[in-house]
Amino acid sequence: MASAAKGKILAVIGDEDTVVGFLLGGVGELNKARKPNYLIVDKQTTVQEIEEAFNGFCARDDIAIILINQHIAEMIRYAVDNHTQSIPAVLEIPSKEAPYDPSKDSILNRARGLFNPEDFR
């Protein structure tokens, strides 16, 4: 029997409610270096900690998608905008306190720029 290739995982950066929801869904994992694939952001979390976690998740080869609350992505917008690799994909998601605003999603805006609206008529 052939062994299955190891799959890639999600990473989550968000408020406690968002991250706990995903952890309850089974996405929490520690890598070989005992580093988690999530960061809970609260009032005491610094922008530097958020940016380090984001860059760390981008550098990991076991992560395929990074989910980040949009209001937290705004705090490190320069880092999110500088990420141009397709993997890991970065998806901005709403939180309980901050609804999703498509106009602030730089990745969505970049994707819109790839297509001509006339192509969809």
From Swiss-Prot:
Query: Which GO BP terms sit in this record?
Result: lysosomal lumen acidification
- What GO molecular functions are on record for this protein? proton-transporting ATPase activity, rotational mechanism
Keyword terms, alphabetized: Hydrogen ion transport, Ion transport, Transport
Gene Ontology CC entries for this record: membrane; proton-transporting V-type ATPase, V1 domain
Question: What does the UniProt entry report for the null mutant?
Answer: RNAi-mediated knockdown results in increased protein aggregation in the oocytes of sperm-deficient young adult females which is not eliminated by mating.
Quote the Gene3D superfamilies the UniProt record gives. Answer: ATPase, V1 complex, subunit F
SUPFAM superfamilies, per database record: AtpF-like
Q: Which Pfam families does the entry link to?
A: ATP-synt_F
Q: Which InterPro entries match?
A: ATPase_V1-cplx_f_g_su (IPR008218), ATPase_V1-cplx_fsu_euk (IPR005772), ATPase_V1_fsu_sf (IPR036906)
Family, as annotated: Belongs to the V-ATPase F subunit family.
Q: What does this protein do?
A: Subunit of the V1 complex of vacuolar(H+)-ATPase (V-ATPase), a multisubunit enzyme composed of a peripheral complex (V1) that hydrolyzes ATP and a membrane integral complex (V0) that translocates protons. V-ATPase is responsible for acidifying and maintaining the pH of intracellular compartments and in some cell types, is targeted to the plasma membrane, where it is responsible for acidifying the extracellular environment. Required along with other vacuolar ATPase components for the removal of protein aggregates which form in immature oocytes in the distal gonad.
What is known about its subunit structure? V-ATPase is a heteromultimeric enzyme made up of two complexes: the ATP-hydrolytic V1 complex and the proton translocation V0 complex. The V1 complex consists of three catalytic AB heterodimers that form a heterohexamer, three peripheral stalks each consisting of EG heterodimers, one central rotor including subunits D and F, and the regulatory subunits C and H. The proton translocation complex V0 consists of the proton transport subunit a, a ring of proteolipid subunits c9c'', rotary subunit d, subunits e and f, and the accessory subunits vah-19/Ac45 and vah-20/PRR.
Q: PANTHER family attached here?
A: V-TYPE PROTON ATPASE SUBUNIT F, VACUOLAR ATP SYNTHASE SUBUNIT F
Give the protein name, as stated in the record.
Probable V-type proton ATPase subunit F
Which organism does this record belong to?
Caenorhabditis elegans
Q: Lineage from the top down?
A: Eukaryota, Metazoa, Ecdysozoa, Nematoda, Chromadorea
Gene from which the chain derives: vha-9
